[in-house]
Amino acid sequence: MIRSLLRSFETALKLHAGLNMHPMHCSRRLLFSQYENRASPSRLTSSGTLGSNEAENDYVPYRQDRETGTKTRVLLEALRERFRFTDAELQKIISDELVHRCYRGRSLTLVMDTLQLEGVSRRSFVEYPWLLSLDNKRLELKMQLLKSMDFKDINHFVPFLRLTVPRLRKLVGALNSERDAMPQRNRVYYISEKLDVSPDIVSKYLSKRLFILEMPFEMFEKNLQHMIDYNVSPINVLKDLWAFRYTPKSVQLRLERAKRAKKDKIMPWMVRCPEPILQRSLKLSLDELKVLGEFSSVVEYLAHRLGFSTSEAKAIMDKHPQVHTVRVTKIKEVLDYLLDEAQFTRFEVAQNPRILCHSLKTTKERMEELKSHGCRPSSLVILCRSRREYDKFLQNWISHERNPQSVSEG
């Protein structure tokens, strides 16, 4: 009996040893393989020399086509290499809101290469940095639509790439429908020729006011001709295109009224502004003409009032350039008060031309206040100072023995 028990025990030991020779090693690999990945560099090196089977199981090859984003450094290097942008130009492109938003999730270099192959110039990338943020697939569709217009240069129509594909398709259809109506083939080139402005500048403004390209051609043509006939500056026409939404008759009437009032610069806003504003503007122009009289400019008028030559009067105004923007009616009122009522000399006015820009009401109030304290300022400087500086001067004057010589007027 004892012998049979010993034999059974030996058999069990042999069976257990046979089963545990390899499974223990495999289970250890399965349970603790995540810790083996943290092995030291020396162990990794040695394992590489022993065999590459284990390393190949964990290696994932790099695929460039899986990378969709563009690092800032890569984008900057690509821009420098292709266009030789200056640092200021690169900063303008990178700081653009759309570019900054998209460069991490989209390959902007691919879009840039596509646009470059289509002929988009260096200047267009600087003027419209958002071009880099366009979706490449939609960009191909947009380029096909623009090419159907037979343009002379893609850069003439770059601003329209910002439109959605359906909106651009509608716009291109409207422009192509007028091909035979004008020798210029479309309105962009028509406006460019009429105003003598580069097509790319025309597109820059028209892309923000698309109604110009879709409104009835007859109405558009007449309004444009009215602007030209009344010598409205081309750039002012492009900057304020809302005037084209009014009927040609009303546009002509408003421009004629401005011309009769002898406005030195007729602006498109005069067509669309409310009637009271137009009347006030025309009245101011007539008042200025009345003040100028025989003189053709504010410089000549100031020279006459102060008794200086025209060149001397211009030098006086140049000391404080803001004087050039002051209406001659205000200059007259200020000079009448300073020279006739306050009894300042022409030289005192010439030394401080800033007084011509200062509020006449404030000037009078300060003069009356100083006069009540027995102070007659030796110059006009203190009258133009800030409220805090003026109050400091006044308190300093009052605290002394009312001696003007003992008070510094700055």
From Swiss-Prot:
InterPro entries, A to Z? MTERF (IPR003690), MTERF_sf (IPR038538)
Provide the protein name.
Transcription termination factor, mitochondrial
Transit peptide start-stop: 1-44
User: Gene encoding this chain?
Assistant: mTTF
Chief site of localization: mitochondrion
Q: What happens when the gene is disrupted?
A: RNAi-mediated knockdown is lethal. Most mutants fail to develop past the L3 larval stage, and the few pupal escapers do not develop to the late pupal stages. Mitochondrial DNA (mtDNA) copy number fails to increase during larval development and instead steadily decreases. Increase in broken mTDNA replication intermediates.
Cellular component per GO, a single term: mitochondrion
Q: Where does the UniProt annotation locate this protein?
A: Mitochondrion
Any one GO molecular function term: DNA binding
Q: Which family does it belong to?
A: Belongs to the mTERF family.
Q: What is the lineage of its organism?
A: Eukaryota, Metazoa, Ecdysozoa, Arthropoda, Hexapoda
* Example of a GO biological process term: regulation of DNA-templated transcription
Q: What is its biological role?
A: Transcription termination factor. Binds promoter DNA and regulates mitochondrial replication and transcription. Transcription termination activity may be polarized with highest termination activity occurring when its DNA-binding site is positioned in the reverse orientation with respect to the incoming RNA polymerase. Required for normal topology and maintenance of mitochondrial DNA (mtDNA) levels. Regulates mtDNA replication by promoting replication pausing, possibly by acting as a natural barrier to replication fork progression.
PANTHER family per the record? Answer: TRANSCRIPTION TERMINATION FACTOR, MITOCHONDRIAL
Keywords on this record?
DNA replication, Mitochondrion, Transcription, Transcription regulation, Transit peptide
